[in-house]
Amino acid sequence: MRILKLAALSCLLFIAPSLSINCDGLSKDQCEQNFPQCQILTAKSCCGESKSYCAERDSNDCLASKISCKKDPQGNIYEFWSSCTPSSGFTDFIPSNATCSSLNCNAQQMSCKYVQQACHETSCCPDIPQCQIPATGGGPATGSATGQGTSGGTPGSCDKVNCPNGYICTIVNQLAVCVSPSSSSSSSSSTTGSHTTTGGSTTGSHTTTGGSTTGSHTTTGGSTTGSHTTTGGSTTGSHTTTGGSTTGPTCGNVNCPRGYHCEVRGSQAVCVADEFDSCANVDCGSGYHCKNGECIRDKVECDACDQINCPKGHHCISQPKGGWIGSHKKRHWQLHPEHCGGRPNKIKVICVPSPKGTCKTVQCPKGYKCKLYADGPTCVKIEKPKCLTCKDMHCESNGLLCVLTPQKKTDEECCPIIPICINPSTIAASTIATTTASTRHSTASTIASLVTGTTSGGGGMGSFGGRSDEESSDPNAILGLFEDDIFWGDNDEYFSDNYRYVDEEDIDEDFNGNDEFEIDVEGDFQEDDFEEEYAFY
């Protein structure tokens, strides 16, 4: 006996390793054969190539949408969106998280542009921001500065010039120029031209911002207050004022760095930063747009299931608005993110086992309908709706009348008639109907009173939908009133058991067109009879 036990134990130890499956490296067919221990998943490369791999299912059934990036031996970068990733064959990869804000290109007098990588299909390969020198635009021009002061003039001075942080003021050919400390005077911004002042008194400002300006500014005698401003581009011309002497700070001797312009504030000429549009110099490239200086991926509406090829015997379903239910999580085969629009951060679609059979070949009994489940088609009971009644409408308390209107849609899940409130003044002639009913457990009866009145034409409500009084006096004509026209009701309750079919025999034989008529409602209502004439209350 002891020998048999030892033999059995040895056998178990021998076969135990074979029970543990290494999912890594298994082919797609092998992985499917070892489901649910192994799970077939896909990763997407930056160039849009989908790659299938087999992974061991974790405690979350691979549902945790943990985005990670890995690189294969060939240098291809893949995005993995599941918590189940290969344990070999890939190395971790951290994508760049640089932004235009982090580069701070403006401080370097440069603009920022997002450069799209050659392959950019996933979040592992975002566009890379780069500082670039604008091809055109304002800013200091290179060259030399020349100028002269004549009688009564004041040469350029840095005494009353405030430069932005990171810049210092220096005199270049009698011009106050804000330059970087590392820049030399010879490479400072310049303006080619002349500035001449003769006598008199002139108070004003002459501002030149960016670009290359060629021309002259001459003031002769008199007293003039004014300003002259040239912004950006290339300007050729002159500005002449005849007046007296020149006193006080002016922007004529100040050349501000790129992104700034000169303003006279009090007793000082100050370089002030230009109003900056954070997206003005940001080029995000295709599929992105700029917002507050940042490039944001464009939102693209799409059906994620269009991108998925499910295994044989499975089909793709999109995530419902209420989220995934337990049966979906347990019975799924493949999980996929939504790779259109924003970065995938949730599981949007899954592949689930396809149901067996079809509802096309199933005929359910009355009161039931066919629904297709994973185990096959099932007849489920139709839940009848809670239909409103005139009692729910409270029309009378608001000075209105309640009418019951039959609906053309005859599904059991829909209310066949609905109550509405109308203004009595909208009723032509004088058509009044009263409806009474007993309790749900007793025989119901409907009493309808028709008081005929004079009608003009054929469009009045007084003759039930435009019928003449002559037509309305015919019992057979009355039968057709309830399907297409308004049926009148009061505060009586109606539902299921109170729906009855109106037979021609139910109408009293002694009915005449001028008196009240009575309809005894006894026949059971059948759905197949819905298209025939019947009354509801």
From Swiss-Prot:
The processes (GO biological process) annotated in the record are: slug development involved in sorocarp development; spore wall assembly; sporulation resulting in formation of a cellular spore
**Signal peptide residues on this chain, from the entry's feature table:** 1-20
Q: What's the superkingdom here?
A: Eukaryota
Keywords tagged on the record: Glycoprotein, Phosphoprotein, Repeat, Signal, Sporulation
The Follistatin-like domain covers which part of the protein? 157-179, 250-272, 278-296, 358-380, 389-415
Task: Give the record's glycosylation annotations as residue positions.
Answer: N97
The UniProt entry, under Pfam families, shows:
Dicty_spore_N (PF04562)
Q: What does the UniProt PTM comment say about this protein? A: Phosphorylated and fucosylated.
Q: Is Phosphoprotein one of the keywords?
A: yes
Q: Which SMART domains has this protein been placed in?
A: FOLN
Entry GO MF terms: DNA binding
Q: Which GO terms describe its cellular component?
A: glycoprotein complex; spore wall
Region (Disordered) residue spans: 183-246
- Kindly indicate whether the keyword Glycoprotein belongs to this entry: yes
- Write the protein's name: Spore coat protein SP70
Organism (species): Dictyostelium discoideum (Social amoeba)
